[in-house]
Structure formats: C-alpha cells, structure tokens
UniProtKB/Swiss-Prot annotation:
Homology family: Belongs to the TTC39 family.
Listed Pfam families: Iml2-TPR_39, TPR_8
Xref: InterPro entries: Iml2/TPR_39, TPR-like_helical_dom_sf, TPR_rpt
Source species taxonomy: Eukaryota, Metazoa, Chordata, Craniata, Vertebrata
Each TPR repeat, start to end: 292-325, 483-516, 524-557
Function: May be involved in lipid metabolism.
Organism of derivation: Xenopus laevis
Record key words, sorted: Lipid metabolism, Repeat, TPR repeat
Any GO BP annotation: lipid metabolic process
Taxonomy, superkingdom: Eukaryota
Protein name according to UniProt: Tetratricopeptide repeat protein 39B
Paired cysteines (S-S): none
Amino acid sequence: MAFVSNGTEADEEGFEDAYENIPVASKMDLRCALEECTMALNLFLNNKFSEALELLRPWAKESIYHALGYSTILVMQSAMTFEPQDVQMGITTMKEALQTCQRFRKRNTVVESLSNLVSKQSGDQLTEEEMHAEICYAECLLQKAALTFVQDENMINFIKGGIKIRTSYQIYKECHQMYSLAASQGKMCSDTHYQFEGGVKLGIGAFNLMLSLLPSRVLRLLEFIGFSGNRELGLSQLREGASGSSIRAILCVLTLLFYHTYISLILGTGEANLEEAEALLEPYLKKFPNGSIILFYAARIDILKGRFEQAQETFQKCIVSQQEWKQIHHLCYWELMWCHSFQQDWLQAYRYADLLSKESKWSKATYVFQKAALLSMLPEDVVKTTGEDIVALFRQVESLKQRIAGKSIPTEKFAVRKSRRYISDNPVKLTLPALEMMYVWNGFTIVGKRADLTENVLVTIEKAEVALQNETKVTEYLADDLCLVQLLKGVCLKHLGRLLQAELCFNQVIQSEKRVKYDHYLIPFTFYELGLLYKEQGDRDKAIRYIETAKGNYKDYSLESRLHFRIHAALSSLKGSPVSTPTTPS
C-alpha cells in the first residue's frame, strides 16, 4: 500500500500519477484505510469524483473510513442534484456505512450502554479502531438524518432524524471526553490518535458553531433535550482541526469557509472574517489550483470583498475546471446571477437565472421568480428580445413551490406571496422586485463594499420613488411599495455613510406601519436596520432597544426566522456575549 501524504508539497499531477499506480489493497487495517482515503480525498478535491468513488468502492463494506468516504460522496451528490433516485442511493449507501461502522464499534458502546449512566467509558477501554468507529458512526448518523429530512415530509421521519442528530451529538461529546482524558495522560501520540483528534474537533466544532447560531427561543428548547452551543468553542475547535494534518483538516477548513462566506451573511449581520477565510484557503489554492470546490470559495470571497469582476473570472474558471458534477456549475450560476445584479446588468443576471430554472432542481419557484424579477428591471423592448412573458412567469411560481422536512422553503413562500399580485386579470406590477430579493439575501451588505455601485443602486431606487409619488392610479399596494422603497433607500444611504438621511427613511417606514396591508415584514426589518444604524453611531442602548422591538413586537410575517437569526447575531454582538450558551462539552 503506497502512503499518500496530505502535505502541501504534492501537486495535482502527483495525485493523478499516484492514483494510476495504486493497486487494490489485499488487506485493510486502520492505518492503510486512512492512507487510501486520503488519496481519495485528494482525488475528490482535484475534480476526480468518479476516480475517488472507484478507489473507495472495493472496501466500502469492510472498512469504516472507506464506508464513510464512499457514502459521503454519494450523499453530497444527492444533496446537489435533488433527484429522487440519487437521494435514495445516498440513503441506501449511508445505511450500509452505518452497518459497517456498527460492526467495528464496541458492544455496549459509548452512548447506548446503560452502564454509561453511572460511569463513562474512557479511551483506554476502546481499541483505536473502536474509537474511530465511534467518530465515523457519528458522522454517518448526521448525514443520514439530513437525508431523512429531504426524502419524506412525514412527522415520523422528522422525529427519527432528530433522534439521529441527538445520538450523533452525544457520541461526539463522549469522544471529546475520551480524547481529553487520553491526551491528559499522554496517550494521544500515534498518527491514528491524531486522526481521531481531528474527527473530534470537526464534530464538536461544527455542532457548537451551528447550534450557537440558533435564536435563543429555539436554543432554550434544544438545551432542554441536551443540546448546547458555544460559538467561540466551535470556532476554536475548527481552527485547531484546520491547522492539523488529519484527513479531516480540509473538512474543518470547508466548514469555516461556509460559515464565513455564507452563514455570517445570510443568517448574521454580514460581518464576515474574510481575512481568516483567505488564509484558510491559500494553501489549498496552491495544492489544488484547478479544484472546483476551492475555486468556488475563492470566487465567493472576491464577491464579499466587492471584487465582482475578478469573482466572475474565477467562477468561469470553476465552471470549465470540470464537467462531471454539473451541480457545481449551478452554484456558480447562482453567484454569477448576483454578481451581475450587484452591477445592475439585469439582462446577464436573467440569463443565469434562466439557466438555473432549466437545469437545477433545487428551487424552481425561486429561480422562476428571479427570472421574472430581473426582467421587471428591464425596458419592455429589451424584455421582448428574450421571448419571455413576465406575467406568465410570476403566475408559474406558486405551482413550483416545494416542501423540505414538511416545511415550505421561506424564500419560496416569500416569492409566492409577492407573485400573487399577478394572478388577477389586471395585475399590479411589483416595485423593484430584483432589489427586494437582493435585500432578502443580505446583498446590500455586499454592494455596500462598493460606493460607486451603491450610488447607482440608489439612483434606481429614487427613480422608482418618484414614479410611485407621481402615480395617478392609486392601488391597494401603494403604501407597501412606498415603504419598500424607503427601506431600500435607507439601507443604501446607511452604506454610503449618510446616516441621518437613512434614519429619516427608516422612520418614514415605521410611521407608515398602519397603512401597510401585505408586506408586514417591512416593519420589523426596518426596526432591525435602525438598530444597526444606531450601533454604527455608537448608541448601543438605542440599538439594542430597536432590535429588541423587532424581536419581541412582531410575529407571523414573511422571513421571520431569517430575521430572528440576524437579530440573535446582532444582539449577541451588541451585548458583548458569545453567540451561545457558554458551555463546554460534558
């Protein structure tokens, strides 16, 4: 069995040569399994997805790491395609992986043994292989739970998924205790022990980080059944895991990148640590210069820094880097759609939304709404050249709505509600629908990095404002539209540093609260924006008061959960406390 280093000195040609020369192993112990799975991981990151699967397949029912790696790739594929047969394949393979891991676990294992209620098992009661089986079993359980939610909407599956997540969480906590005890006794010194440590840091880090993001009302409920989340603990565990040399180091890196480049923006206030993201990505850009996943994150960081032109080039490079997983192309199309939207190149943005609506199954309702919204920003003569009918597109949206884990997708519900204006024989046009969706996705935080583009967006908003003020035919939507325009205008002014003018816009929305008929979300979101404005002015108490008003005084409005995530992040920052309940694994 050839040893494959996961150091940065190996280039992509080396990985390909090594793969071509590697024989199918005649036996597979833990050390050999880790070496071969490292090879498969390198192939995967180098766009050799099928080769990675083929390397793992022969031992997928005999080795815990081959089982985990093989099933994880298929689960990723199913999550990206959303094809029922792919989801079923992912579930079947993950069941087999769980069975493989179960065979290697110690009987009466860490979580399930009744004796553990009295005394915990320590690491020296388990062999190295049994310790790794626990970690791999926990990872498989998490993925199986996620697929359970996607596959079927019924409550039984939802409960089953929740139980799997809790079991996985408990295993990670017990493994953390085993690792801490063994490390304190100087027993964590072999390479396989370091690999176990990497698994613990990934699991404890990811669980704590993701749980810490949850609004306090949700977290209080989860704490009642044994969950807790501490953001700083989560970040520190992931950083330590990312800086190590275990097979899971790259998984820690990707988790941190996802947090910094997506979660912080969509579910937070947009204060992403891009310097850390760039530092984490740099060695992998050198090691996998054409790796599509690595290129994707490099381009995403460029977007968040306002370097839209550079991001577009990198996304195009990502697209041409591989043709096997088209779903990575779809991720690029989504980002390119926003890149062009930020620059108000509505026609090019529409083209990417059109590609998504035809090729991707992730959220047809969102893609078709985006198409119609983007076309709505264009002159009628330009729309005619596309051959599209805006009204017909909006009318399609409701029929395309889907459910995941028994719940409608919030952005789809929002799109459906907005589209209902077009159901009647005399539809009332939406006002600035593409900019409204940009706000929903926190895109103004990104545009705000570029004063020139923010000024251009402000001009578009002010034109819409004048048109509404001069409207001779008053509709039932007029007050809502005027409030939307003032909210968007205020956000632009805030990013341009014109805080007093922004405050006037926000207050105008709040004063119009009783006149709003449909878009009730505008009021709590405006209170939230005012709170952020006062934070920027240094008025901490006023900022907290306004954000607490958004949190406590409104309910049952569109995108409520998304705002509560952002409120949680903002209040935690203002109050100087960790975004969590500060607990350590126990």
